[in-house]
Curated annotation (Swiss-Prot):
Signal peptide: none annotated. It is an enzyme of class 6 (ligase). It catalyses: hydrogencarbonate + L-glutamine + 2 ATP + H2O = carbamoyl phosphate + L-glutamate + 2 ADP + phosphate + 2 H(+). The gene is carA. One of its GO terms (biological process) is 'de novo' UMP biosynthetic process. The active site is at residues 276, 360, 362. Keywords: Amino-acid biosynthesis, Arginine biosynthesis, ATP-binding, Glutamine amidotransferase, Ligase, Nucleotide-binding, Pyrimidine biosynthesis. Pathway: Amino-acid biosynthesis; L-arginine biosynthesis; carbamoyl phosphate from bicarbonate: step 1/1; Pyrimidine metabolism; UMP biosynthesis via de novo pathway; (S)-dihydroorotate from bicarbonate: step 1/3. L-glutamine binds at residues 51, 249, 251, 277, 280, 318, 320-321. Composed of two chains; the small (or glutamine) chain promotes the hydrolysis of glutamine to ammonia, which is used by the large (or ammonia) chain to synthesize carbamoyl phosphate. Tetramer of heterodimers (alpha,beta)4. It comes from the Bacteria. It comes from Rhodopirellula baltica (strain DSM 10527 / NCIMB 13988 / SH1). This is Carbamoyl phosphate synthase small chain. Small subunit of the glutamine-dependent carbamoyl phosphate synthetase (CPSase). CPSase catalyzes the formation of carbamoyl phosphate from the ammonia moiety of glutamine, carbonate, and phosphate donated by ATP, constituting the first step of 2 biosynthetic pathways, one leading to arginine and/or urea and the other to pyrimidine nucleotides. The small subunit (glutamine amidotransferase) binds and cleaves glutamine to supply the large subunit with the substrate ammonia.
Length: 389
C-alpha cells in the first residue's frame, strides 16, 4: 500500500525569505521568533522547555526523531514552543524507552512543524541577520501573504511571556532524579537523607521551570515548594524558606516588574540562586540592564569560563537576552563569562551572597560540568537551616 504524499508547509521570514518543505506534526499556522539550537540530541527536552514560548525552533543537527519520544524525559506538562523546524525526521525510532514517534507527539500537542528545508541556509541567515519574526503554515501557501503575516507578528521584546507558562498555584515537589544521578550527587555531597522535615526548605519561583531543576533540589534532601513567578516576597517568606530558587523562563526580563520587586525584597533575607531568566531577573532587581542578543545562545555546547577558578565548563544554554556590562551595579560581581562572545554568564551579590548563572546546570539535556552550582547553593541552605551535611 502506497503512503499518501506529505502535505506541503512553508516558513516565511519577515525579511521576505520563504522556505518550502513538508508538514511535520499538526496542521495549521503559527508565528514566532525564528531561532536555532545547536544540540545534536535532547529534542524532547527542548520541545517541553517553557523557555521556548513564542519561538519557532530550528534544530541545526540534520536528523531528528531517531530515538522517539518517551514519558520520562519531559521537562514540563506539555510543549510551549510556537513551532518546530528540522531538516529530516528519522523514519524509524529505536530506543528501549521509546513510546512513539516525534511527528506523532508534535501532532498530539498541536505543534506545527516543518521538515525538508535547508536548515543550514536558514541558520546562516539567522546568524548573519539576527533572529527574526516568522510564520509557519500548512494552510496558507502564498508567499506574499505569509511574509506580510510575519512582519505583522509580535516580537519578544517587551512581552511578558512568563504569564503564559507559569503555574497558577503552589505545589509541593516530591520527584527525584534517576537512581544513577542520585548516587552521583549523594556521593559528592555525602548526604543521603530525603524527606526529613528538618531538612532545608527551598521555594522555587517558577517562571517556566524545567522539571529537572526541582529534581536536583529534591535529590539533595531538600523540601521543595514551587510557587508561581508572580508570588510576592511576603507570600514566599510566610512559607519560612531556607532559600529561594529563581527559575528559567521565556522572553524579555524587563517587563517582569513584579519579579524585580519580589526578588529585591528577598535579597539578604534568605539565600538566593537563579539560572537563565532567573539570572537576568536577579541582575535587574539589583539595578542592572539587559539587552537582546543578535541570535541568542541555544545549545548544549556553550563554553563558559569560571573567573574564580579559571576552569572552562561546557554548558547548556537557552536564552535570547543577556545582562549588560554597561552600568552593572557595584553590588554585583561577574563570576562567569561566555567564551564565544564574552557576555556575562554569572554574577554574585557582594553583600548577600546571592548568585546566578545564565546557563542550565541541571543539564536536561546537556553536560554535567555545572552540577557543582547546586552543591554551592546547598551549602548556603545547610548553613541557614543549621544542618550539617
Amino acid at each position: 500500500m502506497m503512503s499518501s504524499p506529505a502535505k506541503a508547509a512553508k516558513l516565511a521570514l519577515e525579511d521576505g525569505t520563504v522556505y518550502t518543505g513538508t508538514s511535520l506534526g499538526a496542521e495549521g499556522e503559527t508565528t514566532g521568533e525564528v531561532v536555532f539550537n545547536t544540540s545534536m540530541t535532547g529534542y524532547q527536552e527542548i520541545l517541553t522547555d517553557p523557555s521556548y514560548r513564542g519561538q519557532l525552533v530550528t534544530m541545526t543537527y540534520p536528523e531528528m526523531g531517531n530515538y522517539g519520544i518517551n514519558s520520562i524525559d519531559l521537562e514540563n506538562r506539555g510543549t510551549s514552543l510556537a513551532g518546530f523546524i528540522i531538516r529530516n525526521e528519522s523514519r524509524m525510532h529505536s530506543n528501549y524507552r521509546s513510546e512513539g514517534s516525534l511527528s506523532d507527539y508534535l501532532n498530539s500537542q498541536g505543534v506545527v512543524g516543518i521538515a525538508g528545508i535547508d536548515t543550514r541556509a536558514l541558520v546562516r541567515r539567522i546568524r548573519s541577520e539576527g533572529a527574526m519574526r516568522g510564520v509557519l503554515s500548512t494552510t496558507d501557501l502564498d508567499d506574499a501573504s505569509l511574509v506580510a503575516k510575519a512582519k505583522a507578528s509580535p516580537g519578544l521584546v517587551g512581552r511578558d511571556l512568563v504569564q503564559e507558562v507559569m503555574p497558577t498555584q503552589l505545589e509541593k515537589w516530591t520527584n527525584e532524579l534517576d537512581d544513577w544521578t542520585i548516587r552521583e550527587i549523594r556521593e559528592a555531597a555525602k548526604d543521603a537523607s530525603i524527606g526529613d522535615d528538618s531538612r532545608p526548605h527551598v521555594v522555587c519561583m517558577d517562571f517556566g521551570m524545567k522539571w529537572n531543576i526541582p529534581r536536583h533540589l529534591r535529590s539533595r534532601g531538600n523540601r521543595v515548594t514551587i510557587v508561581p513567578g508572580n508570588a510576592s516576597a511576603d507570600d514566599i517568606l510566610k512559607m519560612d524558606p531556607d532559600g529561594v530558587f529563581l527559575s528559567n523562563g521565556p522572553g524579555d526580563p524587563e517587563p517582569l516588574t513584579y519579579a524585580h520587586k519580589a526578588i529585591g525584597e528577598l535579597l539578604g533575607q534568605v539565600p538566593v540562586f537563579g539560572i537563565c531568566l532567573g539570572h537576568q531577573l536577579l541582575s535587574v532587581a539589583c539595578g542592572a540592564k539587559t539587552f537582546k542578543l543578535k541570535f541568542g545562545h541555544r545549545g548544549a555546547n556553550q563554553p563558559v569560563l569560571d573567573l574564580e577558578t579559571g576552569k572552562v565548563e561546557i554548558t547548556s544554554q537557552n536564552h535570547g537576552f543577556a545582562v549588560d556590562d554597561q552600568g552593572l551595579p557595584d553590588c554585583l560581581e561577574v563570576t562567569h563569562r561566555n567564551l564565544n562572545d564574552d557576555t556575562i554568564a554569572g554574577v554574585r551579590h557582594k553583600d548577600t551572597g546571592a548568585f546566578a548563572v545564565q546557563y542550565h546546570p541541571e543539564a536536561a539535556a546537556g553536560p554535567h560540568d555545572s552540577h557543582y552550582l547546586f552543591s554551592r547553593f546547598q551549602e548556603q541552605l545547610n548553613e541557614k537551616c543549621g544542618v550539617t551535611a
